[in-house]
Every structure is written in C-alpha cells, then in structure tokens.
Design a protein with these regions (language model features):
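Low-complexity, acidic/polar, glycine-enriched regions of mature
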Residues: 1-185
Length: 185
C-alpha cells in the first residue's frame, strides 16, 4: 500500500477490536471479544512487516457474565495462571490487498502456528498530527490444540462448544517516535 509509511506502530486499543466466534450446541454462534490488547507492528522499508501482540485473557467479554467467568476459569483460559495470549509473526507473504501473516500463537504456554489473512485498510494523519495505519485480519484455529478442551456432550449427540475458533481483528495503529523505532529494532 503506497499510503503506509515505514516504522513501528503501536496498537491503539480505543480504536481496535479482537473478536472471536465459536459454535454453541453445534447450531448457533457465540461471539466475544478481548478488551485489553497491546502490541506493535513494524513496517520496514524493504522486507516483511512483523507483529508482536499480547492479549489479556481476563479481558474476555461475551456479554454474559456467567459464561465469561467460566471462560476465565481453569476449564478454559485459567487467567490467574496464564494471564496473556501472544501472537508473534514469523513470515509475511504479500497478496493483492494485504498479507498472509504467519505466526506463532501462544495460549496457556502452548504455541502453534496460525495464519492470518491481513487487509490493509488505509493510512492517514489524525487531527492531533499522529500518523495512523489500519488493518483488518481474519483467521481460525482449533481451541483444543491449545489446551482449551473443556466440553459437555449433548443428549442428541454432538458437543456444547465447537472446537473451531474464528478470529476477526480490526486494528488501528499509531506510529511511534523515531527513537522508539530504533529501540524496537
């Protein structure tokens, strides 16, 4: 994207969303989000962009407190013992409108490769003079690969919670000062 400037950008949590969707009872989809997301994306003059993102597991929100409490428990994320999810990119392949971003996703100390399809949404300067870039991304993974194995069998067959997790990310990032770019490199 010709509008995207090189440098290191930090996620703007007020203008970014990390959402997920999982089948419930094999017939409906439950959606949720994580409210506490931090990280950086570095866009070099040449070569591949890199990403390093952390998500606070306790910030999970499905709009149902009882379900959120269960998701924070040892049955799922065990937020007391494993307070963060982390994604670190390992490779980026250019596509027509963005990137295939390959990386390592770590949940509960289990790391597995995940691929995100990233679309460049635009770049600009906000009213306060901050350089911004925006990306959207989608991906999926099997939750049981990360030790998120709790489930309950249904009388008619099947299970309560689906294994496939679909991710949807909308991120706005703000360019960091040049001195910070050098420190991050």
């Amino acid at each position: 994207m010709s509008n995207v400037l090189t440098g290191t950008y930090a996620i703007d949590p007020a203008h970014s969303n990390v959402e997920f969707a999982v089948k419930h009872m094999m017939i409906t989809t439950v959606k949720g989000r994580f409210g506490d997301v931090k990280g950086t994306i570095t866009i070099p003059e040449k070569g591949e962009p890199t990403a390093d993102v952390t998500i606070a597991t306790a910030s999970i929100d499905t709009r149902t407190e009882a379900r959120d409490t269960h998701l924070r428990s040892a049955d799922f994320f065990d937020v007391e013992k494993f307070p963060q999810i982390r994604f670190v990119s390992t490779k980026a392949d250019r596509t027509d409108d963005g990137w295939k971003l390959l990386g390592n996703l770590t949940i509960k100390e289990t790391t597995r490769p995940v691929t995100l399809t990233v679309t460049e949404e635009g770049a600009g300067v906000d009213p306060w003079g901050n350089q911004k870039v925006a990306f959207s991304a989608i991906g999926k993974f099997n939750r049981t690969d990360f030790g998120l194995t709790w489930n309950a069998a249904l009388e008619a067959g099947g299970v309560l919670v689906g294994e496939e997790v679909k991710l949807s990310i909308d991120a706005q990032l703000v360019k960091q000062a040049a001195a910070q770019d050098k420190v991050a490199a």
